[in-house]
A protein has these predicted regions:
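Transmembrane helical elements of multi-pass membrane transporters/channels
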Residues: 19-38, 142, 176, 205-209, ...
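Short alpha-helical transmembrane segments in multi-pass integral membrane proteins
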Residues: 1-21, 81-148, 190-245, 303-368, ...
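N-terminal transmembrane alpha-helices
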Residues: 8-48, 61-76, 80, 84, ...
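Short runs within selected transmembrane alpha-helices of multi-pass transporters and secretion channels
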Residues: 143-161, 169-177, 198-211, 293-297, ...
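Residue-level hotspots within the lipid-embedded alpha helices of multi-pass solute transporters
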Residues: 28-32, 68, 108, 112, ...
Length: 449
């Protein structure tokens, strides 16, 4: 047993959680910068920044779908690999890693081909108008070239975190994000490439991150090694990954469906300005929830490892602390959106109309997100413990069962504001339900551990 993963079961819990969560939070924050920095620069392009920002916002469902497939393979396999490390079965952990990598390559080919062929009708379906389609198409056409890099960088980085190497995982993201921040103004403004320049900067940055991740996993520094032999897909391994990966996949892919529903509703009841406001709201949503997800992803290996080792008291203590920290995080970050929305909104646009509208709807939209940390912590606990069915139900609850129907029904009675109010209603109901399911499920799992 390597001392780096052994400490997951023996190091002082508070210090261990901090050492793993902090780099993971930093990595997630940095990762958000890929798309958010693009939007910040794009929104300030002279002459057409407002239309360009709306157009790029329309591509969000495609970007989310690409990330969802990386989560399917990465987050579906990494907890399983961590559990195997806890059982001191390195060979099985490496087999899971290799099959995940094989899936990521396969997904990249399929996604690139599909969206390249059907991008125009898809973008119109996602809320693009004749005034914004050119910017949406310019951005996504180039972004799709780098799908393989996004898949590998995001999906395989979970295996670096899963073996307790949170700092290495953070560097994987940091390298690409810093490069993206530097290249964006160069390609957008200096080389006058506009929206296309933002996409080129993102692709190049993700490529560097992907190379870094793969290089680490094939090296002797990695507790579990990535090999070509293990990339040959095996039915039993894929079934295991799919069982656990379907939940994070649904969590992310349904974000695309949510965005489509919201954008089409806003286009119908409001127009381009309202779609533009949603682009900003989605970006701020990432700024609030991604750091919390970073906390849960950093702590996840502790739960999975100790679950595999049968250390129930350590599992219980870890989950309690994770819930408290996540709730505190969303209360603070969402509080800014509720009480001082101009702080977030001003980052993305200087258009007076868009500023006023977004500042008006942001406090309403983020009311429920203030307690969403509970949902994030519980969801990660289900995944970490291998509770695939429960995790799947929770993933479906908030978005498919609650949010999408509410976003369709409420504007019929409340007008365009009904779309914004659907989010907090769905969030509160989902958090309450998840909390009840968590208490029942965890008691049963710990009793049988």
């Amino acid at each position: 047993m390597n001392h780096r993963d052994e400490r997951l079961g023996s190091a002082p819990l508070g210090k261990l959680m901090f050492s793993l969560a902090l780099p993971s939070v930093a990595a997630q924050l940095i990762n958000v910068l890929y798309n958010i920095v693009d939007r910040m620069y794009i929104g300030h392009i002279p002459g057409y920044g407002n239309a360009a920002l709306t157009g790029v916002g329309v591509t969000f469902p495609i970007l989310t779908m690409i990330s969802a497939f990386s989560a399917f393979a990465g987050m579906g396999g990494a907890p399983l690999a961590s559990i195997q490390l806890g059982k001191q079965n390195r060979q099985r952990a490496e087999q899971i890693l290799g099959n995940s990598a094989g899936l990521l390559v396969l997904f990249s080919v399929i996604l690139t081909a599909f969206f390249s062929i059907f991008k125009t009708p898809v973008l119109y379906a996602f809320g693009a108008s004749d005034a914004t389609i050119v910017y949406a198409r310019d951005y996504i056409s180039i972004y799709l070239i780098g799908t393989i890099f996004v898949q590998l960088a995001l999906g395989l980085n979970a295996y670096i975190s899963g073996q307790g190497e949170a700092k290495i995982a953070m560097l994987s993201v940091l390298i690409g994000a810093v490069l993206n921040i530097c290249l964006d103004p160069l390609f957008i403004f200096v080389l006058h490439m506009g929206v296309r320049g933002a996409a080129v900067a993102t692709v190049l940055s993700q490529a560097v991150s992907a190379i870094w991740v793969v290089h680490f996993l094939v090296s002797e520094k990695s507790v579990m090694r990535l090999t070509l032999k293990n990339m040959h897909l095996k039915k039993d391994v894929i079934k295991m990954i799919a069982g656990l990966g379907i939940s994070p996949f649904i969590m992310q892919s349904t974000e695309s469906l949510v965005t489509i529903t919201l954008n089409t509703g806003l286009q119908r009841y409001g127009g381009d300005l309202y779609v533009g406001s949603m682009s900003i709201l989605m970006s701020v949503m990432q700024m609030i929830t991604i750091p919390v997800q970073g906390i849960t992803q950093g702590i996840q290996p502790i739960i999975s490892y100790n679950s595999g080792a049968g250390n129930k008291e350590r599992v219980k203590a870890t989950m309690k602390r994770m819930i408290l920290v996540c709730l505190t995080g969303t209360l603070l970050l969402a509080g800014v959106a509720i009480f001082a929305p101009q702080i977030y909104t001003g980052l993305f646009t200087d258009n007076k109309g868009l500023l006023e509208l977004t500042c008006k709807v942001m406090p309403v939209y983020f009311l429920g997100i203030s307690i969403f940390g509970i949902q994030c912590a519980c969801q990660t606990s289900f995944i970490s413990l291998g509770q695939a069915k429960v995790s799947l139900f929770i993933a479906l609850l908030r978005k498919i069962i609650l949010l999408i129907p509410l976003a369709v029904i409420l504007p019929k009675f409340m007008g365009v504001m009904g779309i914004y109010r659907a989010e907090p209603i769905a969030d509160v109901i989902s958090v309450l339900t998840t909390s009840a399911v968590f208490i029942i499920t965890v008691k049963k799992v710990l009793r049988n551990m």
